[in-house]
């Protein structure tokens, strides 16, 4: 007869449960040929994602230092100080600003790739926990970040569904951390685009000097957003790990 718990596999000859359901709780590997969704540990991916987000925050700190130096030295130039020391600092500020911009772009790309892989993993796990608890198709885990307009709310909606499905106690936890992360993400995205446009139009020392406070604001918001994103990743990863070890992983048909 079929297992009385999962209703997918034959029960063991001497019981009413299959070998999968009688296995120790936690993340299990599917039997060969089983076309099912199975829990897979998000711990390694979660830690890697959090580390990259921490690196992004560190790069933002470096960028803030470069911004302040640029603001300071352009203020001297605007004030008429063109001594050798000021010119040397101006060259250093140019170099540090360029390095910071390149580092931010590289880390952003790395974070995006690893984050989406982690997001896909926790979404699949959440479907195992709660097959009917998701309002958006799984493909939106990726498409939601790149399709115009829907990117303003789809990733948050998916995250909330995953968050609720992953609550170890079986009751949805509060969404304050997710909402704070998403607000900061929208803010840093908008500020980044505005500041990039503004910086691209700044040609004179006065214009560069005037753009630096906005640049520092954008880098500061990005720093906080990265830290909140890491907090969400670590919290959700821990929630899924705890939930997986509360009971056996039950397979669900695709």
What is each of the regions a protein language model found here?
Residues 2-94, 114-142, 152-191, 195-208, ...:
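Membrane-interface extramembranous regions at the lipid-water interface
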Residues 49, 107-110, 211:
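N-terminal hydrophobic alpha-helix used for membrane targeting or insertion
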Residues 88-108:
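Interfacial helix-start motif at the membrane-water boundary
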Residues 101-107, 111, 144, 218-221, ...:
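Alpha-helical transmembrane segments of integral membrane proteins
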Residues 146-149:
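All-alpha RGS (Regulator of G-protein Signaling) helical domain and cognate RGS-like helical scaffolds
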Residues 174-175, 209-222:
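Individual transmembrane alpha-helices with interfacial aromatic-anchor signatures
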């Amino acid at each position: 007869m079929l297992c009385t718990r999962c209703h997918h596999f034959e029960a063991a000859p001497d019981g009413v449960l299959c070998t999968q359901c009688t296995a120790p709780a936690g993340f299990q590997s599917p039997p060969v040929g089983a076309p099912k969704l199975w829990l897979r540990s998000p711990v390694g991916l979660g830690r890697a994602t959090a580390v990259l987000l921490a690196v992004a925050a560190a790069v933002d700190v470096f960028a803030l230092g470069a911004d302040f130096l640029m603001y300071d030295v352009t203020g001297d130039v605007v004030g008429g100080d063109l001594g050798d020391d000021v010119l040397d600092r101006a060259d250093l500020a140019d170099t540090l600003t360029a390095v910071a911009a390149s580092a931010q772009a590289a880390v952003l790309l790395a974070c995006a790739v690893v984050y989406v892989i982690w997001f896909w993993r926790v979404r699949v796990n959440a479907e195992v926990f709660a097959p009917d608890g998701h309002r958006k198709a799984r493909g939106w885990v990726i498409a939601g970040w790149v399709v115009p307009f829907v990117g303003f709310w789809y990733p948050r909606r998916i995250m909330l569904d995953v968050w609720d499905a992953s609550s170890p106690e079986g009751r949805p936890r509060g969404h304050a951390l997710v909402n704070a992360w998403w607000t900061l993400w929208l803010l840093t995205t908008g500020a980044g685009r505005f500041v990039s446009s503004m910086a691209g139009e700044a040609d004179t020392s006065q214009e560069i000097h005037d753009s630096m406070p906005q640049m520092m604001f954008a880098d500061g918001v990005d720093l906080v957003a990265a830290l909140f994103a890491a907090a969400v990743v670590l919290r959700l990863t821990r929630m899924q790990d705890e939930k997986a070890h509360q009971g056996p992983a039950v397979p669900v048909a695709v």
